[in-house]
Amino acid sequence: MTVVLPTGEITHLGATVSKTSSGYSLLNLMIGSEGTLGIITELTLKIIPAPKATASLIMPFEDLKTALETVPKLKMSSLNPQAIEFMEREIVLASERHTGRSVFPQEMGGQPVGAYLLITLDSDSDDQLYTLLEQAAELVLDAGAMDVLVADSPAKMRDAWASRSAFLEVIME
């Protein structure tokens, strides 16, 4: 990234390696400053191809504590989730009323659900994705999930993430 500073000085930020120094990242500061620290005049982006296979998992838990304790286990695993969200029951219920979509189960085996994790996994093939989904299911069930529900179609994934995306609107009402 090339930036012109308020003094007129031209500076180049970024590197071809993932870690070049400790301390503050001038690159991230510049991006986050929205033009107040300098003007970006040149930017190089690395574009990666879209995944060939994607699915989301809805994982109900009896309580928020167990759901939250599962997040680091997912992040430290080899699954490399594209997204992880945790949600409490009350906001999910309000969101589903707001969107008119009923995606998240309210009880499992007669037990009320207290919290949810919603994750998205992607892969270069359906077979590889299926393996990742099995690994994720095993990990979260061992961690205390009540069940694992697969949103494997674009419509199911859209409904699950639309409920999550509506949280801010629901809170503002």
Q: What are these model-predicted stretches?
A:
Residues 1-173:
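Noncatalytic alpha-helical scaffold of FAD-dependent oxidoreductases
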